[in-house]
């Protein structure tokens, strides 16, 4: 990856972008130059001060008893006999995700060892705080905790859309982290099937074809579109708008709205985003559901894909290029990108609409033993977390135990290295790589970038966001490399990158 690429030229001009940036840069520089609110760089301190911090940092560290009084539960198979005051600490930097209630600190007993977990940022510079856990949607390069301490790892939890933070789709951004839990199967703790409760969800009964045909005779279209989140990186509305020229598409959401839901209750968006029985029964009458994700990335698959399959509708899908790997059999979805144009897709949908026998082939996975994909079945069986399953941990608790076990292993390896006086090698750092997220540059939903007018809002928003995220990843990486302690200097680094880009172009 780099500063080039077809989308790079589509960024806003220097005046528009950097007027905004300069304001923030100036404000950040002034904050860095002043006394600040805890932005001073820690000094050498003394042996009794966590991480050698002094002054503001010493006051920010909780007293020892705060990490001794945490609740304790001895899980089966865990023989860790250490007291709380000897355990590694994991800090949920994104405190809203802290998966323990009530309180701010908890002891967790995982398969291979125990840790304390906390959401109190006062623990950030404690010598026993071994890992910081960040939520990808909330992570901002200009707010990252600096300086980055050498004894701490950074962990990323990001189950949501790539559009929430394109910083993570560039090598400088994703390589900031040591452990990852993302929708990609290549991540350390994959969450790929987070929207699929189990194989039984796919086997749910479909509405009889006769009822769907009766629905058609009442004037309803064969194709459903239900979206209220418009202007997204996948640019799905642009494609659907073109498709509508060739086949009837009933659109009930705010995007391309052309039909009203039959009741005020169903028109409530909160109902339309849940598996409400009335809502589900209504949309199950449609033969085809347009299932276009808001962003394109390998293994990013949401309820837009799985819900139609649960109901017995056929998804007309665009999203993960690798979606076939996860399908129950070889004929269960229709891929938009298999067709040369929306017109060709419309012809095929019309053919299936008029030929029930051919249409029903797409629902054969619902038959007894109809799920033929062993990779899918084994992946569901192998995952250690559950979806709406009280017998299994949720993926937040699972990921923190994943980190806990690896941090305990790292601590033991470091102790062994120190005890052997170098004869035993020090543990090598585990670094996330591009495939842990690695989502491509957004492209238009229909046509090419070159075909779009200069003032196209999608082009101005998403191409700029994608490439600015690369710059932000490079800026934060440089700050960490230079052991910066002032967040406000982020905009100085961004300015340097901007000047470098300007010289290159």
Curated annotation (Swiss-Prot):
It is found in: Endoplasmic reticulum membrane. Keywords: Disulfide bond, Endoplasmic reticulum, Glycoprotein, Glycosyltransferase, Membrane, Signal-anchor, Transferase, Transmembrane, Transmembrane helix. Residues 30-55 are annotated as: Disordered. Its EC number is 2.4.1.221. It holds the Pfam family Glyco_tran_10_N. It comes from the Eukaryota. GO terms for cellular component: endoplasmic reticulum; endoplasmic reticulum membrane; Golgi membrane. It catalyses: L-threonyl-[protein] + GDP-beta-L-fucose = 3-O-(alpha-L-fucosyl)-L-threonyl-[protein] + GDP + H(+); L-seryl-[protein] + GDP-beta-L-fucose = 3-O-(alpha-L-fucosyl)-L-seryl-[protein] + GDP + H(+). One of its GO terms (biological process) is positive regulation of protein secretion. SUPFAM superfamilies: UDP-Glycosyltransferase/glycogen phosphorylase (SSF53756). Residues 1-12 are cytoplasmic. The chain crosses the membrane at residues 13-29. Residues 30-505 are lumenal. Belongs to the glycosyltransferase 10 family. This is GDP-fucose protein O-fucosyltransferase 4.
């Amino acid at each position: 990856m780099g500063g080039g690429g077809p989308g790079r030229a589509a960024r806003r001009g220097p005046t528009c972008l950097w007027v905004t940036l300069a304001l923030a840069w100036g404000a950040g520089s002034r904050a860095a130059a002043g006394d600040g609110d805890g932005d001073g760089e820690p000094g050498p301190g003394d042996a009794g001060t966590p991480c050698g911090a002094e002054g503001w940092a010493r006051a920010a560290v909780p007293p020892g008893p705060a990490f001794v009084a945490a609740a304790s539960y001895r899980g089966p198979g865990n023989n860790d006999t250490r007291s709380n005051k000897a355990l590694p600490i994991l800090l949920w930097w994104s405190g809203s995700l802290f998966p323990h209630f009530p309180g701010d600190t908890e002891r967790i007993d995982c398969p291979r060892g125990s840790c304390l977990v906390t959401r109190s940022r006062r623990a950030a510079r404690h010598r026993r705080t071994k890992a910081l856990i960040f939520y990808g949607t909330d992570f901002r390069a200009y707010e990252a905790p600096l300086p980055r301490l050498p004894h701490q790892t950074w962990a990323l939890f990001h189950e949501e859309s790539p559009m929430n933070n394109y910083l993570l789709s560039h090598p400088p951004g994703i390589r900031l982290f040591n452990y990852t839990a993302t929708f990609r199967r290549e991540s350390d703790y994959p969450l790929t099937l987070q929207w699929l409760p189990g194989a039984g969800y796919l086997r749910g009964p479909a509405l009889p074809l006769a009822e769907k045909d009766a629905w058609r005779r009442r004037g309803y279209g064969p194709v459903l579109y239900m979206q209220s989140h418009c202007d997204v990186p996948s640019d799905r509305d642009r494609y659907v708008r073109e498709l509508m020229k060739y086949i009837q598409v009933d659109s009930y959401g705010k995007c391309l709205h052309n039909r009203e839901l039959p009741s005020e209750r169903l028109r409530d968006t909160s109902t339309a985003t849940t598996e409400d029985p009335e809502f589900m029964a209504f949309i199950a009458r449609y033969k085809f559901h347009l299932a276009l994700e808001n962003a394109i990335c390998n293994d990013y698959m949401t309820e837009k894909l799985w819900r139609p399959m649960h109901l017995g509708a056929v998804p007309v899908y665009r999203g993960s290029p690798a979606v076939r790997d996860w399908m129950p059999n070889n004929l269960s979805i229709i891929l938009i990108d298999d067709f040369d144009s929306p017109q060709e897709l419309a012809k095929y949908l019309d053919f299936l609409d008029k030929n029930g026998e051919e249409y029903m082939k797409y629902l054969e996975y619902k038959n007894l033993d109809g799920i033929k994909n062993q990779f899918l079945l084994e992946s569901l069986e192998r995952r250690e977390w559950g979806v709406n399953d009280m017998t299994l941990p949720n993926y937040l608790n699972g990921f923190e135990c994943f980190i806990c076990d690896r941090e305990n292993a790292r601590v033991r390896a470091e102790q062994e290295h120190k005890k052997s006086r170098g004869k035993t090698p020090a543990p090598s750092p585990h670094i996330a790589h591009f495939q842990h997220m690695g989502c491509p540059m957004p492209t238009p939903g229909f046509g090419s970038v070159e075909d779009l007018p200069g003032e196209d809002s999608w082009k101005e928003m998403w191409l700029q966001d994608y490439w600015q995220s690369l710059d932000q990843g490079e800026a934060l990486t440089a700050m960490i490399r230079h052991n910066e302690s002032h967040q406000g200097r982020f905009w100085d680094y961004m300015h340097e990158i901007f000047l470098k880009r300007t010289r290159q172009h």
